[in-house]
Regions:
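Conserved catalytic core of the tyrosine transesterase superfamily
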Residues: 1-269
Length: 269
């Protein structure tokens, strides 16, 4: 028997985000639709089914959920090994610095101040969009935001001085002294989905490739720019909130466009 309620209580006793909890519960529900109990044989069959039907990253996400469930019910020895994900030799769909600067100038020109600060904060702090919407006026005044990661580790998101001064002026114009700074038209905190959808619309308006305009793209831009100006990957890993420096190493790679430009410049034979 699959103990879904027990698992959900277990998850809610951790520091996992709501999105992660939902994802893990979905995986257990999916397993439960095929099998009515947990055995090593059925776990292996489920893994084979996942591999046949999903991409490696999704397979590993499901396996991570299953392994967490196995911990919950005291069956750690049955944990399933992850499948190997073939890493690409380049970063995909990262907004270029030129497009980022162009995007900022367009938003400023058209008085799209709210969206100007959305992309400014994402690209200048390296915040995830789920972290961005937690920023308050108090954090802007302070110059940083402290958050706790999934493992309970403290992460500080710094707001650079130039951005801080700009944002303080914006808040003063709005006469906002406290509270969340990124609100929707109803005065509620904007959702991550709301940000993603509007960024795509703005990309189309300004003739920027929509494939490179999404919240995490600006976090990638932050990491790329940081490494180009300060080649300290350990420091960047801390700023990004990465558990392992290996995760941060991807930013040492060039984008596909950068690779093409280098090859076109160098290869003349």
């Amino acid at each position: 028997m699959i103990e879904k309620e027990k698992f959900e209580r277990h998850l809610r006793g951790t520091n996992l985000s709501e999105n992660t909890i939902s994802s893990y519960m979905f995986a257990i529900k999916q397993y439960g639709e095929q099998y009515d109990d947990i055995t090593q044989k059925k776990l292996r069959e489920y893994k084979v089914w996942l591999i046949e039907n999903y991409k490696p990253k999704t397979v590993n996400l499901r396996l991570r959920a299953i392994n967490c469930y196995l911990e919950c019910i005291g069956k750690e020895k049955w944990k399933l090994p992850f499948v190997r994900v073939q890493q690409k030799s380049f970063l995909e769909n990262v907004i270029s610095e030129a497009d980022y600067e162009y995007f900022k100038s367009c938003l400023k020109r058209d008085d799209e101040t709210f969206w100007y600060f959305v992309i400014r904060f994402l690209a200048a702090t390296g915040a995830r969009v789920s972290e961005l919407i937690q920023i308050k006026a108090e954090h802007v005044k302070l110059g940083h935001l402290d958050l706790y990661s999934k493992g309970g580790k403290l992460r500080r998101i710094y707001i650079p001085k130039e951005l801080q001064n700009e944002a303080l002026s914006w808040l003063a114009e709005k006469q906002q002294e406290s509270g969340f700074i990124f609100l929707n038209k109803y005065g509620d905190r904007i959702t991550t989905r709301g940000i993603s959808g509007q960024l795509k619309k703005l990309a189309v308006r300004y003739d920027i490739n929509p494939a490179v305009v999404y919240p995490h793209s600006f976090r990638h831009r932050f990491a790329k720019n940081f490494l180009e100006r300060c080649n300290d990957i350990a420091f960047l890993a801390d700023l990004m909130g990465h558990e392992s420096i290996e995760t941060t190493r991807i930013y040492l790679r060039k984008t596909a466009t950068e690779q093409r430009e280098i090859v076109d410049t160098i290869v003349d034979w």
